[in-house]
Amino acid sequence: MNNQRHKIIEIAVAVLTAIGKIIFMDILNWRLPFISIVILGWGSYILWQRKHHPDRIIQWGFRTDNWWSVSKRVLPFALLAISSFLVIGLLNNSIQWTWHIVPILLIYPLWGILQQFLVIALVAGNLQDLDEHKQRSGSIIFITSLLFAIVHYPHAWLMGGTFLLALFYGYIFLKERNIYVLGILHGWLGALFFYTVLNRDPFSEVFAKYLN
């Protein structure tokens, strides 16, 4: 298959996955089944590409050689974001103090890595690869951030937060191409955002009906 066509198809399937998130997670409330299928499906695709086209894995950002340099670049932003979440949570009295945050902090980075793979690596990364002259990075980052925000409709705080985060993620990824650091960061920031700003408990939302 033509390489350009392949990248376009990947973008299209990533967008369809985002639409599926709205339908199955937000409308039908099939959170755990949808997350499980997405992780299994896309995880299998990543493993297949790793076996047959290992260079693509590096291109997608599954690499550790620049781990520390990327971590140093995102650390100030992470500290600023966490401080902002806590201030907003204290002002709005929206902080949830519950042990549920512990398992979410442990497992949400896996979902964060997959989200970053779909939105940042496949959409932003492929769009950059298709841009022969590499002159549209700003537009690519904006489009990707807009998509990431729309996926979180209708939650205004979540849409605003993910849009700003994606602007930063997109900028870093197009410079460094490391999905591990961005995915783990997104998982931790996302978990803290739910429990501080949104006053929501994703652990209960996803697992409660299966544990009761």
Where are these regions (language model features)?
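Function-critical hydrophobic alpha-helical transmembrane segments in multi-pass membrane proteins
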Residues: L90, S94-E132, R136-I150
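Short, aromatic-rich membrane-interface segments at the entry and exit
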Residues: L28-I37, Q96-I101, A156-F163
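Structural signal for the C-terminal ends of transmembrane alpha-helices
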Residues: I22-I23, L47-R56, V87-L91, I172-K175
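Alpha-helical transmembrane segments in multi-pass membrane proteins
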Residues: M1-H52
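Functionally important transmembrane alpha-helices
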Residues: M159-N212
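Interfacial transmembrane-helix boundary/kink motif in multi-pass membrane proteins
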Residues: N2-A14, I35, D55-I82, W99-Y108, ...
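Juxtamembrane "helix-exit" motif on the non-cytosolic side of transmembrane helices
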Residues: G20-L28, F85-Q96, P202
